[in-house]
């Protein structure tokens, strides 16, 4: 399927060709001047549309991850990661009810185990995960995501997650984590963290 950028799509919807324009109050801009008849033939300044945050494709793990690592190792990883989160600057995101927190961790472990090819425990209990929607009540910024991933590296190392499937698991959570950002704090795109940049830490 052909993909369009936002500016191209808007131009096609309006059915007008855009040109660079100059406005006495704004100077020369990268905005586009559209001849819109409903404005009496006057040219209007239109700032081009652009994507604020582009989500990369998310490749889920194959069932090889569950076969090699084992469901219990995946669950151990999720629990260790959340133990680190609970004792990190991200703890306020989860509230003060530690009992509720660990109950939610069990559901998260179900989801990760199922996503990696394990039993469908999560969908049997909760149905579709709707991850982005479920995270909307919490403020998650770019730097929160980066710390979340840093702690994942530490958790992978601490539980000795099998290196032969660590990259497959990492590429899933690294890309997926971008979709959890719901409060922009910079115009720069989220930092990508390829597996090759963290692999050496897992061998320590």
Each predicted region: which residue ranges?
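Core of compact, soluble alpha-helical bundle domains
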Residues: 2-204
